[in-house]
Amino acid sequence: MLQINVKKQLGKLALQANIQVPDQGVTAIFGLSGSGKTSLINLVSGLIQPDEGFIRLNDRTLVDMESQESLPTHLRKIGYVFQDARLFPHYTVKGNLRYGMKHVSQDDFNYIVDLLGITHLLKRYPLTLSGGEKQRVAIGRALLTDPDILLMDEPLSALDVPRKRELMQYLERLSKEINIPILYVTHSLDELLRLADRVVLMENGIVQAYDSVEKIWNSPIFAPWKGENEQSSVLALPVHLHNPPYKMTALSLGEQALWIHQVPANVGERVLVCIYSSDVSIILQKPEQTSIRNILRGKITQIEIQDSRVDLAVLVEGNKIWASISKWAQNELRFAVGQDVYVQIKAVSVM
């Protein structure tokens, strides 16, 4: 576990954080430019010293200003991936990977190289690599130092769209397979949804919220960040069963099931999905024959009147699902808070 309880004055920015990060998974540090995201991970790495407080990683104290303890950066067992790859141009890819490598067997080396898809690049030099390839090598180099935590500072920000898509696939795989925590700085909603398990929401140096990605996404405090013309709901649901003949997977939603296109996940494994309100309609009675597979019972908990539509929040087995209907439909059907209804979900996006 990573414990951060620090204060730091950085010019006009007063950074303050008090969070505990579990020992696995991706914790995204999210916010606008200048909100203190990079400064927070630099405090963890030792590139910046706090004015007050402490940082502890597992059973080690990285810094404690009260007792004047501070481990040098090179002794903190931290892997750091910057926005730019920062590879040594005079070393091959293999040479870059082996630089700083500690206590790593050949089998582990081969595993990391295969995980990042860079086996065919080992004899090449950085000058001949694409931006995405350079970042994969930089990630591999960081992992091969045998770190207790991996810090990533917007590793996709300098890449064009095709390279971002390419690297994202490897990051998704990486986040599921390595057994150390990852602190991932980003201001991208797409990266947040696809990679993060938890989110630290920062604004003006202060941690505004810290929770699971689905709770942060669905909370009112996050609404201004989404900037959508419609509502959306993010749910993390366990796999209930697979239906191979139809290539479908059922996710457990309390006593009900949410069907999605088949995913390569084991029963019990959680899958993150996003449901947009434009893909949801509301009915009073469950139809007997319909092509829509996802029809779930719930209770209306919130109604918001917009310029050209009405948004309704329906609580389904403890999960809020938004639906958008026309004002005409609302005037005719008179939906009300507390009313039992069914939601028809036409599409579900798997993150």
Curated annotation (Swiss-Prot):
This is Molybdenum import ATP-binding protein ModC. Gene3D superfamilies: 2.40.50.100, P-loop containing nucleotide triphosphate hydrolases (3.40.50.300). Coiled coil: none annotated. The keyword Cytoplasm does not apply. Part of the ABC transporter complex ModABC involved in molybdenum import. Responsible for energy coupling to the transport system. GO terms for molecular function: ABC-type molybdate transporter activity; ATP binding; ATP hydrolysis activity. PANTHER family: ABC TRANSPORTER I FAMILY MEMBER 10 (PTHR43514:SF4). Belongs to the ABC transporter superfamily. Molybdate importer (TC 3.A.1.8) family. ATP binds at G31, L32, S33, G34, S35, G36, K37, T38. It is a peripheral membrane protein. It comes from Haemophilus influenzae (strain 86-028NP). It is found in: Cell inner membrane. The complex is composed of two ATP-binding proteins (ModC), two transmembrane proteins (ModB) and a solute-binding protein (ModA). It catalyses: molybdate(out) + ATP + H2O = molybdate(in) + ADP + phosphate + H(+). Keywords: ATP-binding, Cell inner membrane, Cell membrane, Membrane, Molybdenum, Nucleotide-binding, Translocase, Transport. GO terms for cellular component: plasma membrane. Its main location: membrane. Residues 289-351 form the Mop domain. It comes from the Bacteria. Its EC number is 7.3.2.5. Residues 1-229 form the ABC transporter domain.
